[in-house]
UniProtKB/Swiss-Prot annotation:
Subcellular location as annotated: Cytoplasm
Keyword annotations of the record: Cytoplasm, Metal-binding, Zinc
Protein name from the UniProt record: Protein SprT
Cofactor note: Binds 1 zinc ion.
PANTHER family listed in its UniProt record: PROTEIN SPRT (PTHR38773:SF1)
Gene Ontology biological-process entries: response to stress
Gene Ontology CC terms, in alphabetical order: cytoplasm
Cofactor: Zn(2+)
Amino acid sequence: MPDQLNSRVETCYQQAEAFFKRTFKRPVVSFQLRGQKAGVAHLHENLLRFNPQLYKENAEDFLRQTVPHEVAHLIAHQLFGGSIQPHGEEWQLIMRGVYELPPNRCHTYAVKRRSVIRYIYRCPCPDSDFPFTAQRHGMVRKGRRYLCRRCREPLVFSGETRTE
């Protein structure tokens, strides 16, 4: 899986070098990205991070659009410095001029939402389910208290969880 992507990164750099007639420092490429982002360019670290799940599900478009998109950020930074806008004129110039691609800001890949566990808290009021996030549940375990707005009694963990 990473071989094709690494090869595409190298091809993008070679295209940029031919276009600008200069060399560019190659980045470190990582597959340590999760969530909704397909890729991230870390300008000061000269690092590209890619989402392996989105790559696997959208390989063709990922190689055609996402990889040049992220490489263009690093090229723009090396050419124009840190005072440019992330998807500004300079980046767009590279997308259109070097890669002959539309300068799309965001991908349209289907992103699966992960299931979320809710911890059910209750008070004496009838029908008083309060679904807490894992973070809020953790705060209660550390001693934080939450009160019902109706009866002003503390909310107590019922022992139940719900997956959404």
